[in-house]
């Protein structure tokens, strides 16, 4: 990449998509990145963000960012129809492609099945390449700071296997945010740390944003609609006929987008079914292992008792039970 290309890439808007479990602080993180409260953020288990929202801003360092706040895209309690619509909506808002996907986790809560599903579902929908654009952001920095702890201290307390896997897959790109801080220096510092990771993502991908098959299909469909509407407007049709043609074009476009949503919905259902099978298999294996462990322990205890009884000459009736007294008698004769 030459100097002019680097300058162009630096000035280009970077699409930053926030994903994660409802209640982890995606909206608050979006506000921290932008530098003001633009997304509604409240500590509610049901979440506040009901649909994908976007806001463009310029960081103190001059980076132009487009932050896309999402609802619980992979929330197990919502329908596949809703999720598929919002995934399509998210890709529409990321004009030019995805520069960074931020998996927002919280140090306040344990890793849930939903969060584990988020990663695998991203891979199913977009392929393993999406991991090259992944950053893991931990909220709850205020809680760690109150206990004089760092993010590394948090990991030393016991890092779940899922986290080790995620961080390994994304080259350990992680950062902690304190979305509650009033310290202006702290606010700027944590955004700079985040943008340093964004720069690493860009370097790894040679400045190219993620544009998977789904994104390209949405882009193509959107451009088709614009082109067709422009052609219709340029024609000498009457007002009523023009409105009719535009309506028909929009209906055709909506039908195609609906087909795309159905495709995403089916992929999500397949992923969900695979997760259920995997969890069921894991639970079955754990139960079998638990039963085997109990059986082994019983067998071990039985053998140990048997050996002790033999050593004491109390274990087996008959000849074996006479070994100890016979041995003592022989010793006395000798």
Curated annotation (Swiss-Prot):
Residues 139-142 are annotated as: G4. Residues 47-51 are annotated as: G2. GO terms for biological process: cellular response to heat; endoplasmic reticulum unfolded protein response. Residues 20-27 are annotated as: G1. GTP binds at residues 20-28, 41, 179. GO terms for cellular component: endoplasmic reticulum; plasma membrane. Residues 272-306 form a coiled coil. Induction: Up-regulated by brassinolides and nematode infection. Down-regulated by 2-aminoethoxyvinylglycine (AVG), high CO(2), isoxaben, and propiconazole treatments. Residues 178-180 are annotated as: G5. Residues 69-72 are annotated as: G3. Mostly expressed in pollen. Also detected in lateral roots and radicles. The keyword Signal does not apply. GO terms for molecular function: GTP binding. It holds the Pfam family AIG1. Residues 11-219 form the AIG1-type G domain. Belongs to the TRAFAC class TrmE-Era-EngA-EngB-Septin-like GTPase superfamily. AIG1/Toc34/Toc159-like paraseptin GTPase family. IAN subfamily. This is Immune-associated nucleotide-binding protein 3. It comes from Arabidopsis thaliana. The gene is IAN3.
């Amino acid at each position: 990449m030459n100097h002019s290309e680097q300058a162009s890439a630096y000035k280009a808007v970077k699409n930053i998509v926030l994903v994660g479990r409802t209640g982890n602080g995606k909206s608050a993180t979006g506000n921290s990145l932008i530098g003001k409260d633009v997304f509604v953020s409240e500590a509610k288990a049901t979440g506040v963000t009901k649909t994908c929202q976007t806001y463009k801003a310029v960081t103190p360092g001059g980076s132009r960012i487009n932050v896309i706040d999402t609802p619980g895209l992979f929330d197990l309690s919502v329908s596949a129809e809703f999720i598929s619509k919002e995934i399509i909506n998210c890709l529409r808002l990321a004009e030019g492609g995805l520069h960074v996907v931020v998996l927002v986790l919280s140090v306040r809560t344990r890793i849930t099945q939903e969060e584990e599903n988020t990663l695998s579902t991203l891979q199913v929908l977009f392929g393993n390449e999406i991991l090259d654009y992944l950053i893991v952001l931990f909220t709850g920095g205020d809680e760690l700071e109150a206990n004089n702890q760092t993010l590394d201290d948090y990991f030393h307390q016991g890092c779940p296997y899922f986290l080790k896997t995620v961080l390994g897959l994304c080259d350990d790109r992680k950062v902690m945010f304190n979305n509650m801080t009033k310290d202006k220096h702290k606010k700027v510092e944590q955004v700079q740390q985040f943008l340093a990771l964004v720069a690493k993502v860009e370097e790894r991908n040679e400045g190219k944003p993620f544009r998977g098959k789904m994104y390209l299909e949405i882009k193509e469909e959107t451009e088709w609609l614009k082109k067709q509407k422009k052609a219709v407007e340029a024609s000498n049709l009457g007002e009523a006929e023009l409105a009719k043609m535009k309506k028909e074009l929009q209906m055709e476009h909506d039908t195609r987008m609906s087909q795309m949503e159905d495709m995403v919905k089916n992929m999500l259902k397949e992923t969900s079914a695979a997760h259920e099978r995997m969890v069921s298999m894991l639970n079955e294996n754990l139960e079998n292992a638990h039963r085997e462990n109990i059986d082994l322990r019983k067998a071990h205890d039985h053998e140990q008792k048997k050996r002790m009884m033999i050593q004491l000459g109390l274990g087996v009736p008959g000849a074996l039970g006479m070994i100890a007294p016979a041995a003592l008698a022989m010793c006395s004769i000798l």
